Design a protein with these regions (language model features):
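Sec/Tat signal peptide C-region and signal peptidase I cleavage site
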Residues: 16-20
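Transmembrane beta-barrel domains of bacterial outer-membrane proteins
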Residues: 56-57, 127, 135, 156-172, ...
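Bacterial N-terminal signal peptides
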Residues: 7-15
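Alpha-helical protein-protein interaction scaffolds
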Residues: 21-209
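Bacterial N-terminal signal peptides that target proteins for export
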Residues: 1-7
Length: 431
C-alpha cells in the first residue's frame, strides 16, 4: 500500500477587501487561475503586508504552481503574523508540508519540532500534524503525537495505514498491529476498496509483527549413491532418514525487520542399511540468531552444539543463511504463477575445523488448489554442497522436484501463519 499524507483544509472567512476588477486574487484562486492569484496576492501585500490571510493565499497559489520552497516561505510569514492558534497551527503544518514537497525534509522536521515545543499548536488537528510528521520522515514525532488515543477516532483507512507503517518503523509492534487492523476495518467502508493483493500485504505485515514464537519440524528420507572416493564400500544407494525440530523465541519483537531470537534445535539422523558408512547420531543446538538488514533475509547465528548420544558432537558454531524468491506464498487474481526461490547456508565448527555449505536455486510454476490454501509446485533446481570434512569437499547436482504445501491458521486481519509441506526431489550429480 502506497503511503500518503493528508492535510485538513482551513476554511477562512475573509473580511479583506477584494482586489482587482475580476474579483481579486481570491476569485482567481477559486477559478484555478493560480498565476493571476499569485500576482494579485503580491500586489495586495504591497499595501497590506501584515495580513496573514494574504500571505496564506500567496502560499497556496505558489503551491499550486509547484513553487514549493517559496510557498513554504509565504506560509512561514503567515504563521508569524497570525494571532489565532488554529490559523497558526494550519500555516505551520502547511509550511512543513511544502518543505517536504520541496525535498527539504530536515527543514520540515525543524518546523515540526518547534510546534511540538508549543503544545497548543499540535493540540489542534493532531492527526494532521502526525501525518505531516510521517511525510517529513519524522516517525518519532508522529508516534509522539499518536500517543493521544483520542485522535484515532479521526482515522481514515489511509491515515490508519500510514500511522501503522510509521509505528512499525519505530519498533512499536503492538501499536502498528492495532493501526493495520483499524485500516482493514475502515477499508470496508471505502468506495474504492483495497485490492486483494493490498489487503494480503497488510495481513502479512500483521503476521510478521505478531510472530514471537516459531516452531519448525522436519522429517526427511533420502537415498544417495556413494562416491568412488569411498573406496571399498559398495556402490549401491545409501538410505537415511532424518527427524528434527527447532523452536525459537524473538526477543524485543520485530525491530523493524531486524529481529533477535534465541533458539533450540534437535536433529536425529538414522542410516538404514547394515553397511552404513556413518553412524546414527542425535545432535542438539542452542544459540542466538540475528537478522541485521531489514530489506534482506540474511540471518546470522552463533550456537553451541551438544551431542545427545555417543555419536553427537560438542562444538561451537557460527552460521549465515540467506534466502528469497517470488511466488512462494499464494497470489491473487490468477490460479497459477511463476515460482522462484534461492537459499544459501554456510556454517563453521570451531573445534572440528569444518565448514559446511549448501546453496540451492529453484524455478517452477505454482498452481493454486481449492481455496488457495493448498499450492502444488513442480520445479527444476540446481544444488551445490560443501563439506571440508570429506575427501571430496564440493558437489554440484541438478534435477526436478514437486512440492505440495498447505497453508493454515489465518484470520480476517492476519495472513496464514503456518504450513505443512510435502516435497520430493530427484537429482543427478553433475560434479
Amino acid at each position: 500500500v502506497r503511503n500518503a499524507y493528508t492535510l485538513a483544509a482551513l476554511v477562512c472567512i475573509l473580511s479583506t477587501p477584494v482586489y482587482g476588477q475580476d474579483g481579486g486574487p481570491f476569485a482567481d484562486y477559486d477559478a484555478g487561475r493560480f498565476q493571476q492569484a499569485e500576482s494579485g496576492a503580491e500586489d495586495a501585500l504591497e499595501t497590506d503586508g501584515q495580513n496573514p490571510v494574504l500571505w496564506a493565499l500567496l502560499a497556496e497559489a505558489r503551491a499550486k504552481l509547484g513553487d514549493h520552497a517559496n510557498a513554504a516561505q509565504a506560509f512561514a510569514r503567515a504563521s508569524q503574523l497570525a494571532s489565532d492558534i488554529d490559523a497558526r497551527s494550519y500555516y505551520m503544518r502547511a509550511q512543513a508540508l511544502q518543505l517536504v514537497n520541496a525535498g527539504q525534509h530536515a527543514e520540515a522536521r525543524t518546523i515540526i519540532a518547534a510546534a511540538l515545543a508549543e503544545p497548543s499548536l499540535t493540540a489542534v488537528d493532531t492527526l494532521d500534524w502526525a501525518m505531516v510528521a510521517i511525510a517529513a520522515k519524522d516517525d518519532a514525532a508522529a508516534q509522539q503525537l499518536l500517543d493521544d488515543e483520542s485522535v484515532y477516532q479521526g482515522f481514515t483507512r489511509q491515515t490508519a495505514l500510514d500511522a501503522a507503517y510509521s509505528a512499525k518503523r519505530r519498533g512499536l509492534d503492538k501499536r502498528a498491529v492495532r493501526f493495520f487492523e483499524r485500516g482493514l476495518v475502515l477499508d470496508e467502508t471505502e468506495t474504492e476498496r483495497l485490492s486483494d493483493e493490498e489487503r494480503e500485504a497488510i495481513r502479512r505485515e500483521v503476521r510478521e509483527l505478531t510472530r514471537d514464537w516459531s516452531f519448525i519440524g522436519q522429517v526427511s528420507y533420502s537415498t544417495s549413491g556413494r562416491s568412488n572416493t569411498l573406496g571399498a564400500l559398495p556402490q549401491d544407494d545409501q538410505r537415511a532418514i532424518q527427524v528434527g525440530a527447532e523452536i525459537s523465541r524473538r526477543i524485543g519483537g520485530w525491530r523493524n525487520g531486524r529481529p533477535f531470537s534465541v533458539f533450540g534445535r534437535v536433529y536425529h539422523s538414522e542410516f538404514l542399511d547394515d553397511d552404513a558408512f556413518a553412524d546414527d547420531a542425535t545432535q542438539g543446538w542452542v544459540g542466538v540468531r540475528y537478522k541485521p538488514f531489514s530489506a534482506l533475509n540474511l540471518n546470522v547465528e552463533g550456537s553451541r552444539l551438544i551431542g545427545l548420544d555417543r555419536d553427537g558432537i560438542d562444538d561451537w558454531s557460527v552460521r549465515a543463511a540467506i534466502s528469497g524468491g517470488e511466488g512462494i506464498e499464494p497470489e491473487f487474481g490468477t490460479s497459477d504463477w511463476s515460482y522462484s526461490q534461492f537459499y544459501g547456508d554456510i556454517s563453521y565448527l570451531f573445534d572440528n575445523d569444518v565448514t559446511y555449505g549448501i546453496a540451492e536455486g529453484r524455478y517452477g510454476r505454482a498452481f493454486a488448489l481449492g481455496n488457495r490454501s493448498t499450492i502444488l509446485t513442480p520445479y527444476g533446481f540446481v544444488r551445490a554442497g560443501l563439506d571440508t570434512g570429506r575427501i571430496q569437499e564440493g558437489s554440484l547436482g541438478a534435477g526436478g522436484g514437486l512440492a505440495l504445501r498447505h497453508w493454515f491458521d489465518e484470520t480476517d486481519t492476519t495472513a496464514w501463519r503456518g504450513f505443512i509441506e510435502f516435497d520430493i526431489q530427484a537429482r543427478e550429480r553433475i560434479a
